[in-house]
Amino acid sequence: MFSLDFCLAKKQSIKREDCFDRCFPPAHGTILDEKLVSHHPSCYNSLERESGKFGGKQMKQSFRWRYFFQQVLLILSACALFLLNARSISTVKVLPLSALALFFWTKYDHRLIEWRPRFWAWNLFFILSALGICLAPMSIFLSAFADSKIIVVLQNLSGIEANLLVRVICAILVAAAMWFAFCAVRYFYALLLPVATDIAADFHAIELWTLAGVSAILMIAVAVLYLHTNAFAHPWLECDLLYSSDSGACIKYLSYFRIGGVENDIRSPLFALFTAPFLSIPYLLSLLLPVANAQAMVLTMAQVPIHVLTWYLFIKMIPNCSINQRLSLLVLALASYSGFLFAFFPEQYIIAVFWVALFLYRLIQHNRREDFLVVGAAGTMITSAAFAFITERQDEKPRLGSTIKTILLTGLKGVGALFAFGCLDVLLSYQHVAHLFTYTNVSGSFMQKLMQYSAHVSSTLFAANAGPIVMTSEINEWKDIALGSMVWHEYPVTVISIAGVIIFSLALIGFLLNRKQILSKASLFWVIFSFAVICLFGWGTSENGMFLYTKYFGWAFFILLVLLVQKVLTWLHLEKYAAPVYLAAGVGLFLYNLPQIKALLDFALTYYPA
C-alpha cells in the first residue's frame, strides 16, 4: 500500500527470479505467466530481452490495456462502496477525486489489483471479510437516504415505492462494492502479513498459547457480562454512560466499518480502513446470533485478542526479560484498572494503540520503519502522527534533509490513502471540527488541568475515583442521555493525586536510568506528549474524562516503571526474582482495584440489565 519502492522495482537492480517471487508465489504459474508480466514492467523488460516469444510492443500494449480495464472496474466498484458509506449526498461531489487518486494508486502499486495469496483458503477469508464490510453500512444507508431528494426524484421517474427503491439501490451497491472490498482486504493483508510473520517468528510457542488462553478467558468474561448488561455499549445511550466513552456510538454508527462513520472524523480519519479487515467476519457472526446486543458483544470479544496482544508487544520490547518475566508482566498489565476494564469496552483507542505497538515493535526489534504502520497509527488516531518523526537507527547520524524527506513522504502516503480509499468525508465534516474544540481548555486554569492530569496518571494503574451520578444536563454532542439518567463518571478532581505524582516521578527516574534505550526514549516522548495534550491543550479536561485516555497513554508509564524496577533488581542482584515480583504486584494491584470493579459491575447490572 505504501511501498512505492516495490512498484518501481525496475529502477532497482534485482534479478528476474527475485522479481517473480515478490510479485507472485511459485504456485501461480511459470516464468512466462501473463499475469506476472502485466503485474510488473521490469519483469516484462527482462523477459523481452531474453525471449522472442512475446511479440514485442504489441503484446506489451495488450497487457497495458488489460490492466487499464481492471483499474476502471476496480474504481467503479470502489465508488459503489464509497456511496454505501457516505455521510450524505454531498459525498458524490468528491467521488471524482477519489476515483482519480485510486487510479494513480493502482498505477504505481499493482498489488491492490493483482496480488495473490499463496493458499486458496485465504480467498475465502477475504470474501467473507469483504461481505461483512459491504453489509455493515446497509442499515444506516437505508435510513439516511429513504427521504433524500434523489430518492424522491427517482421514485417519480420509476413509480417504485420509496422504501423498495432504496433497498434495490442498496442491494445493487452492495453487489457492485464486493470486488473493491475483496481487493482492498486482500491488499491490506498483503501489506500486514510480512510484518506479522516477522513478529510471530519472535514468539515462543508458550507465549502464543498463553496469549490465546488469556484472550479466551477474557472473551468468555465479555460474553457473560454482555448477556447480563448493556451498559458497556448501550443501544441508545450512545456516549458518556460509563466515564466519557463513546462505546454505544461506536457500535450504533458502525465506526469499525463505515468510512464515513460519525466517529471517524478528523481525529480518526482512516479508522475504518485499518479496522474493518479485522472485525468484518466477527460482524457477520453477530448477525447470526439471536441476542439483542449480539453485535456489541461479538465485536468487543473480537477486540480482546488485539487488546492482549498490544500489551504483550509493549512488554516484549523490554530488553533482558525472560519468558516467565514477560508473562508475569502481562498479568500485571491486565491487572491494572485500565488494562482490565478496557477489555470490556468497544473503544477506538484499543485499535489505535495496537497500531502504535506494531510500529514501535517493528522499529525497535527489527529496525524497520514501516510507512504502512505509521499511517495505520496516525490514521486510527491522528495524534499518533507524532511517531512519524521517529526514524530508523543508523550507524551515521541521518541528515536533516533526509529525515524531513522521509516524514513528508509518509505524510503524502497518508493523504493519498485518504483520497484513494474514500475517506474524503473527513474533509467535508469540517463543521464538526469547530465542535471538537469544545473538548479543549487551552485558556483554563493550569493548576486544574494539572490536578486532572495527576488523576489520569494514577488511573493508569489504580482505580479512578468515580461512581454513579445523575445527569443534570444533556450531552452537547449527542443529546441522547435524558435528564435524570444514572451514569458512572469520575468525580471532580480538587487535589493533586499523590499516586499520580509518584508514578510520574518514578517514570522519569526510569527513563534517566535507561536513557540510551530507544524504547525508553519513545516512552518518555509519549509521556511528555500526554502532558502537552492534557495540561497545555486541556483535551478532555472540560468533560473531566481522564480515564478514557489511560489506554492511549498508559503504556508509556508502564514501560518506564518496569525499566526502573528492572534496574533496581539488577543492582540488588535479584534478577531471578523478577517474575515473582511482577506476579505478586499484579495480584496485589487487582485486589486493590477489585472493590471499584465490583461497584462498577453492580451499577451496570442494576441500572442497565440486558
Predicted regions and their residues:
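Transmembrane-helix signature of polytopic, membrane-embedded enzymes
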Residues: 314-335, 521
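Specific aromatic-rich, kink-prone transmembrane helix
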Residues: 339, 351-368, 556, 560
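Short acidic/glycine- and proline-prone juxtamembrane loop motifs at membrane-interface regions
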Residues: 344-350
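Hydrophobic, aromatic-rich transmembrane alpha-helices
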Residues: 103-106, 191-193, 312-315, 473-517
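Membrane-interface alpha helices of multi-pass inner-membrane proteins
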Residues: 82-83, 368-397, 402-410, 584-585
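Short hydrophobic/aromatic helix or loop-helix immediately within or flanking a transmembrane segment
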Residues: 261-297
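Membrane-lumen/periplasm interface segments of specific transmembrane helices
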Residues: 219-230, 405-499
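Transmembrane-helix motifs of polytopic, lipid-linked glycan transferases
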Residues: 301-321, 509
